[in-house]
């Protein structure tokens, strides 16, 4: 999935982008880390496919002005912006939304909560809970790695 808008600097900020990203994360998570006798197919699917549920209805279509290099004229081009209608965090928002419809296992909730790893606002603010989560729940590390690989190695990002 390539998000064709040149100004979609947020990964997955295009029609179908969230679904495509979630499927990529699932493919990486399952293909790289799944061990049939130890892991649950359902848990891997839930974590990979729903980790970014917080981004549903998160991007708003709009336009912005960009100067045309050839003509020197300003032109309106399609763009996406963030419109966070429910400012509840990122991973924690996904967990909250999922649990309105289904009960997560602790391992699933922790993996989804901390899938952003060191990019999470709580970590950047000085929280040390991430290291405890990664030590106690290996699935959290695996989901984070799968998300990174999908985002930076499989998917193309706009400028």
Give, region by region, the residue ranges found by the protein language model.
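Short, small-residue-biased leader/transition segments that mark boundaries at the very start
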Residues: 2-5
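Divalent metal-dependent catalytic cores for phosphoryl transfer on phosphate-bearing substrates
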Residues: 10-12, 16, 20, 27, ...
């Amino acid at each position: 999935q390539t998000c064709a808008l040149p100004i979609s600097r947020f990964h997955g900020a295009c029609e179908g982008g969230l679904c495509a990203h979630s499927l990529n994360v699932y493919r990486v998570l399952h293909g790289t880390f799944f061990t049939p006798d130890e892991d649950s197919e359902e848990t891997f699917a839930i974590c990979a496919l729903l980790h970014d549920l917080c981004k549903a209805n998160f991007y708003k279509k709009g336009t912005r002005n960009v100067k045309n290099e050839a003509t020197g004229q300003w032109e309106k081009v399609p763009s996406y912006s963030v419109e966070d209608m429910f400012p509840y965090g990122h991973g924690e928002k996904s967990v909250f939304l999922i649990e309105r419809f289904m009960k997560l296992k602790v391992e699933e909730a922790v993996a989804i909560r901390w899938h952003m790893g060191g990019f999470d606002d709580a970590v950047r603010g000085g929280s040390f809970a991430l290291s405890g989560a990664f030590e106690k729940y290996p699935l959290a590390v695996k989901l984070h790695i799968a998300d990174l690989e999908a985002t930076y190695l499989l998917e193309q990002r706009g400028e």
